[in-house]
Amino acid sequence: MPLMNPLNPWPLESSNPLIAVLVSGGIDSLVAAHLLKQSGADVTAIHFLTGYEPEDRAGRLEKLFTQMDIPVFIFDCRTVFQSNVVDYFTAAYLRGETPNPCMVCNSRIKFGACMDYARSLGADAVATGHYCRTTKDPDGVRLWKGADPAKEQSYFLAFLSQDQLGRARFPLERMTKDQVRAHAARHGLVPIESKESQDVCFIRGEECADFIEAQVPAIPGPGPIEDMTGRLIGTHSGLHRFTVGQRRGINCPAEQPYYVAALDMARNCLKVGFRQDLFVPVCRVAQVNWIPDRPKGSMNVSVKIRYNQTEVPARLTALGETDAVVEFVTPQFAVAPGQGAVFYDGDAVLGGGIIRAE
């Protein structure tokens, strides 16, 4: 009879399952690994190299997990991380979009390349320190918000496939950040990375625009700034330095502040408007990943159009298999192409995709 993992309510394939926990050096993955070990699961740890981490982190991790009697494998995925995350990030900016690399990293790296590597080691599942949870029913695997409203991270996992979700384990699913810290203190677990992970982990100590310039030397330079009527009002320093909704760096005096309304990449033109000009009633979403299935017709949902935003009520209509239209109950400010839009029915994640320009 298959073994039930006490941290998730459905059987694993093996009678003696091996769970690989992805460890970064932070407190969340450290506690996740310890909880799995406490549960009686056979646990191994994987630390993946991106090419953008401190050089001494891998060795320090090995020492840390040796104390917990958990073997650590170092997985070099620098090439695939560069092509799937960093290159995606820079290319999106050069298209005038505002990407969310964490969402892509989770689907292509953590639960993509790393999951493949874990399976090559004989692991049945991959665990992380994300604050979210999954359940399984006859229709498939469902993704839910985590217990801590301030830390829950289901938004970042909305691109995971059914196979990926089925092999994912989230030991912190019903814990708050305070409970995680208390567990670490109670068991003497000291992370090697004290800072909270950032949205763009591969940009350290520099501006986003400077990073993009280093990645893509031949980048378009200054160009015109136009207001909403098409009137020329200034010159920008490079479109890769701006995102929709941004106020800083426009430097065009007016009776009220200007905000970035759109980026016209074909003309190398920055379109700006006043705050009231940036509210939109509807947006189109592409490359939608439905969890577990595409809804039929239209339905009322709550939607999050960026991670650090509260969900807002909207009407969701699926168009074909991977497109959708979101009609906001109240027009929303600065809906940025390239960002992830994630749909919720209460605490359940219905799916998510990429916001596209109208």
From Swiss-Prot:
Enzyme class of the recorded protein, top EC level: transferase
Gene3D superfamilies, per the entry: Adenine nucleotide alpha hydrolases-like domains, HUPs, Translation factors
Active site per the UniProt annotation: C105, C201
A Gene Ontology biological process term: tRNA wobble position uridine thiolation
Segments for region (Interaction with tRNA): 151-153, 306-307
Compartments in which it is found: Cytoplasm
Cysteine pairings via disulfide bonds: C105-C201
GO cellular component: cytoplasm
Major localisation: cytoplasm
EC code(s) of this entry: 2.8.1.13
Reaction catalysis annotation: S-sulfanyl-L-cysteinyl-[protein] + uridine(34) in tRNA + AH2 + ATP = 2-thiouridine(34) in tRNA + L-cysteinyl-[protein] + A + AMP + diphosphate + H(+)
Pfam families documented for this protein: tRNA_Me_trans (PF03054), tRNA_Me_trans_C (PF20258), tRNA_Me_trans_M (PF20259)
Sequence positions that bind ATP: L22, V23, S24, G25, G26, I27, D28, S29, F48, G129
Entry keyword set: ATP-binding, Cytoplasm, Disulfide bond, Nucleotide-binding, RNA-binding, Transferase, tRNA processing, tRNA-binding
Gene Ontology MF annotations: ATP binding; tRNA binding; tRNA-uridine 2-sulfurtransferase activity
Record-stated family: Belongs to the MnmA/TRMU family.
Role, per record: Catalyzes the 2-thiolation of uridine at the wobble position (U34) of tRNA, leading to the formation of s(2)U34.
Record-given protein name: tRNA-specific 2-thiouridylase MnmA
Organism: Desulfosudis oleivorans (strain DSM 6200 / JCM 39069 / Hxd3)
